[in-house]
């Protein structure tokens, strides 16, 4: 498994994990930055992540193209930044990423009541990909009894 390193400008402990005060203060390599902050601070966090060498980002909050002229400008700036810095971004405004294989379980989402996972290589494992968080949540709720291996919900702007 990987290591979780929360970032909080005030420091402290978050859900039992010791935090660092900035993205640049993370001492170990980072495979994925999960960004869950207010929309007007996201571009700075993406820049700081890129400066730190983090190329994969998951941005859960909205406040972009769906939020009127300010959000559209923010979305265009994010797309430009991603292209200039070679970033892979899922989001913004998405329900997250869920991988339920018991050998490599990962969930960066606000969705609850995740189903039990199944081994991704088994014939009874089901992978579901959705661009709609609402559809993914409905699928998770209604597909109880199915063994899932992955439920990612990227949203492309």
Give the ranges of each region predicted by the language model.
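Catalytic-core regions of core metabolic enzymes
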Residues: 1-157
